[in-house]
C-alpha cells in the first residue's frame, strides 16, 4: 500500500503533446504544430537581460551548440542580438559589474572522431563563435550528456557565476540538446525534478520554463524554446529520419 502511494506521488502529469513526443516520438497534431509562432528571442530574452543588468543579481547565458553541426546549430541571430544589447550597456559604469556572462557549451563531443583533441576543439569553437558574432565568452565547455562528460564542471562554474540570486538562461538552436543537458544537471544534483521532454523533433520546448532545484533556492534557471536556424541539418530531414538522430 505504501509503495503504491509513493509511486502515485512520484507520477508527473504531462500534456498530450509531451506524452506523444515522449512515447511515440511524434507530435499529436501537425496542423496545429505548424500554427505555433517562432520564439521571439529579441523581445523575450535580450530585453530582459538589459533590464536585469541594472539589478544586483548576476545574469548568465548558457549557449548550447551541437558540435557535430556547429556552424549549422550556432544561433547567429541570437548571438548578434546579444552582442548588440551588451555593447549598448558595457560602457555604463553603473551596471558594468553586472554585465551578462556568456558560457558556450559544445555538446555531443562523444560523437566526434577520437583524434580531435579537447584543446584543439576548444580553440576551434572559440574561433567559430567569434566569427559568428558572439560576444566575449566567459568560458567554453565541451560536454556529452549521453556519456556524462564535463557536466559536473559546467554545473560548478554556472553556480559560481550566478551566485545566490542570479538568473541563468539556457539558449540554443532547435534540437541542440538543451533539455537533455538540463536533465543531466538535475541528475548531478540528485534531484527528483520533473524531467524535461526530450525528442528528436525540432521545437519540442514551446515556452520559457523555470527549472527549480538545480541552483541555490533564490537563483533561477530557465530553459528556452529552440531557436529556428535556416541552416540546421535537422530541418532537411523528414520525421522518420529525425527519429534516427541521437539527441
Question: Model-predicted segments: where are they?
Answer:
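Helix-rich effector regions associated with P-loop NTPase G domains
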Residues: 1-60, 89-101, 196-247
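Helical mechanochemical/support elements of P-loop NTPase systems and associated helical scaffolds
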Residues: 11-14, 74, 121, 150, ...
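Conserved Switch II/interswitch segment of TRAFAC-class P-loop GTPases
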Residues: 23-29, 35, 56-79, 103, ...
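Short coil/turn segments at secondary-structure boundaries
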Residues: 28-30, 74-78, 116-119, 154-156, ...
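Well-ordered, non-membrane alpha-helical segments in soluble/globular domains
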Residues: 40-44, 74-86, 117-125
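Loop/turn segments within WD40 beta-propeller blades
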Residues: 66, 163, 212-215
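Canonical P-loop GTPase G-domain recognition
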Residues: 86-174, 183-199
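Conserved lysine of the Walker
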Residues: 178
Amino acid at each position: 500500500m505504501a509503495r503504491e502511494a509513493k509511486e502515485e506521488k512520484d507520477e508527473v502529469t504531462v500534456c498530450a503533446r509531451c506524452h506523444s513526443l515522449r512515447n511515440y516520438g511524434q507530435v499529436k497534431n501537425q496542423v496545429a504544430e505548424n500554427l505555433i509562432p517562432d520564439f521571439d528571442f529579441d523581445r523575450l530574452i535580450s530585453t530582459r537581460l538589459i533590464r536585469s543588468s541594472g539589478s544586483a543579481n548576476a545574469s548568465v547565458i548558457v549557449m548550447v551548440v551541437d558540435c557535430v553541426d556547429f556552424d549549422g546549430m550556432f544561433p547567429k541571430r541570437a548571438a548578434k542580438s546579444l552582442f548588440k544589447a551588451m555593447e549598448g550597456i558595457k560602457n555604463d559604469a553603473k551596471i558594468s559589474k553586472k554585465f551578462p556572462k556568456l558560457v558556450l557549451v559544445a555538446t555531443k563531443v562523444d560523437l566526434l572522431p577520437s583524434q580531435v583533441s579537447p584543446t584543439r576543439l576548444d580553440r576551434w569553437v572559440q574561433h567559430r563563435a567569434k566569427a559568428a558574432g558572439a560576444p566575449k565568452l566567459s568560458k567554453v565547455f565541451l560536454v556529452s550528456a549521453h556519456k556524462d562528460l564535463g557536466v559536473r564542471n559546467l554545473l560548478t562554474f554556472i553556480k559560481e557565476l550566478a551566485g545566490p540570486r542570479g538568473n541563468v538562461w539556457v539558449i540554443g538552436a532547435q534540437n541542440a540538446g538543451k533539455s537533455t543537458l538540463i536533465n543531466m544537471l538535475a541528475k548531478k544534483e540528485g534531484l527528483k525534478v520533473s524531467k524535461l521532454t526530450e525528442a528528436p523533433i525540432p521545437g519540442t520546448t514551446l515556452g520559457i520554463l523555470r527549472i527549480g532545484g538545480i541552483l541555490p533556492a533564490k537563483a533561477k534557471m530557465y530553459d528556452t524554446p529552440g531557436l529556428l536556424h535556416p541552416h540546421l541539418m535537422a530541418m532537411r530531414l523528414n520525421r522518420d529520419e529525425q527519429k534516427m538522430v541521437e539527441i
